[in-house]
Amino acid sequence: MSTPHSDSAFVRACRGERTDVTPVWFMRQAGRSLPEYREVRGTGTILRAIADADLATEITLQPVHRYGVDAAILYSDIMTPVHAIGFGVDIAPGVGPVVEHPFSGRDDLERLRPLDPAADTPYVLETVRNLVTELQVPLIAFAGAPFTVASYLIEGRPSRTYVRTKALMHTDESLWFELMDRLADLAIDSLRSQIDAGAAAAQLFDSWAGALSPADYERFVLPASTKVLGAIEATGVPRIHFGVNTAELFDLIAAAGAEVVGVDWRTPLDRARSRVPAPTSLQGNLDPAIVAAGWEPTRVAALDVLRRGGGNPGGRGGHVFNLGHGVLPETDPATLERVVELVHSTPPGAATEETAS
């Protein structure tokens, strides 16, 4: 099936095809590290900026113009669909998603009505349509995976322990699976609408899946993520599945159905590749904190990532260069500019231990 930008290095690497250059983009490449972002964002809220299609378009384009990355990712938030259906979510500066009335029981299922993208998130569709007419690189659609979104709804804000989430999971399986099913449908409807509007790839963010044991992930989370990724398979766009601290889950994350598994900085890419079936591609995995430390440590670490990414060794899968999580606010944009130059100037498979020292 022909899809937008199907001949681009990014899409080809996602599909496990060999490329002449390693494609690169950065999670949170549009954001607080960019002075031009801070200038246009002003003092309004993130959700208000997302709802302004012209502003969201400009913010999405900023890192593409500055860095010369090989893909853009829509400026939005994984909680946008839940906010749009009126669940009562805000994005608090320095905190993250905050839920006014957290999910606590079966009655709250009624608050999770189906998403009608044309009516509930028309600004997202307008932003995507704006971008596909202006971009020369693929646009990545994205959504929050059911578990990560559920954790915010249940905990009420970011959590380190996920006590309430795991308690619901283990004490009321019926309610848990109904919640996951509804959140899967929200993600599906959001992703399909972005893809129909012209996005060329899709990333499912299960940021906090690493808080789970393999057994809990397989039983309580994998079915819903598989449902989401399976529902968009027919669109033909490559699918990326990313979580943080998921080394023990790589085989299960790959089993959910994406062409690409995102890897954080904790696991070397060559080790990650041994844990996923061929020809699964990998995305990652430069440590964002090292990038914030300046150029020389970044150069060494980036070359090591390229060496371990391997340029599709033996046809086992492609490599999309990225950070292991989002760009930190204190990152110097000039360092990321140099990372892109380095990645593009190093032929796939050419980095060695000597070049990385």
Predicted regions and their residues:
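Active-site-adjacent beta->alpha loops and helix N-cap segments on the catalytic face
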Residues: T121, L212-S225, W265-P279
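Catalytic-face loop-and-helix region of soluble metabolic enzyme cores
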Residues: G230, A234-S357
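Active-site-proximal, glycine-rich beta->alpha crossover segments in alpha/beta enzymes
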Residues: D90-S190
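Alpha/beta enzyme core
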Residues: R157-W208, P214, E218-A231, T235-P238, ...
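Active-site mouth loops of central-metabolism enzymes
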Residues: G42-A56, Y162-D189, D287-P297
